[in-house]
Regions:
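N-terminal loops that bind phosphate or other acidic moieties
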Residues: 1-203
Length: 203
């Protein structure tokens, strides 16, 4: 089995595991400021990707990332599906076009695409409040452990933010004091990816 096959299959399993373990928590966060189904939706998307992992692992890495993104768009639903899907599809396309050496450039372009898709920016209590800090860490080529830590810290910081996008924005000031569920799921996935990559590199 090629290294990228192992990588794709391993990352899919790691992401599925962490979302399954925290799905109820994510839905609990979402009940406070949204529809209450974020954990259920994320788990459905991750299970769909996991079910098709053998097909994805046979693809070149960039293509696999793009195809996984498409699967998430079709299966997660709600606002999160298009955002996570856009992120991965853009990363995959940019890696395919520019080569896999510069992941930071691909990530930067993909995060901007997510911002455009969601019509959001940093500080508005969305998953972008994790994606932008993670992007900063990747650009600076910080260690994987530092990237994971920054993601977790950034998700926590959304507790003090007022929601300006999505259903949570209808709550106005009452959205303050609650962690954004999209930011939390993004931090969880970032942490799972970083920990897997760290272990994979050491193997």
């Amino acid at each position: 089995m090629r290294d990228d096959q192992v990588l794709v299959s391993g990352l899919i399993a790691a992401c599925r595991e962490i979302i399954a373990a925290h799905a109820d928590h994510l839905s609990e966060l979402d009940r406070a400021i949204g529809d209450g189904d974020h954990g259920t939706n994320m788990r459905r998307g991750c299970e769909a990707v996991y079910a098709d992992r053998d097909r994805f692992s046979q693809m070149p890495l960039a293509q696999a990332i793009e195809e996984i993104g498409l699967t998430l768009v079709l299966t997660i639903g709600g606002a999160s599906g298009p955002l996570y899907g856009t992120l991965l599809m853009e990363i995959g396309r940019r890696l395919a076009a520019g080569g896999e050496a510069d992941f930071s450039a691909a990530l930067t372009g993909a995060v901007e695409a997510v911002a455009r898709r969601g019509r959001a920016q940093r500080g508005e209590k969305t998953l972008l409040d994790v994606l932008y800090p993670v992007q900063d860490e990747v650009i600076r080529r910080h260690a994987l452990s530092a990237i994971a830590e920054r993601a977790e810290t950034s998700a926590t910081l959304t507790v003090g933010m007022k929601a300006l996008r999505g259903r949570a924005s209808f709550l106005g000031e009452r959205s303050i004091g609650h962690m954004d569920p999209g930011a939390r799921s993004c931090a969880l996935l970032t942490s799972a990816i970083c920990h897997y990559l760290k272990e994979h590199r050491a193997a």
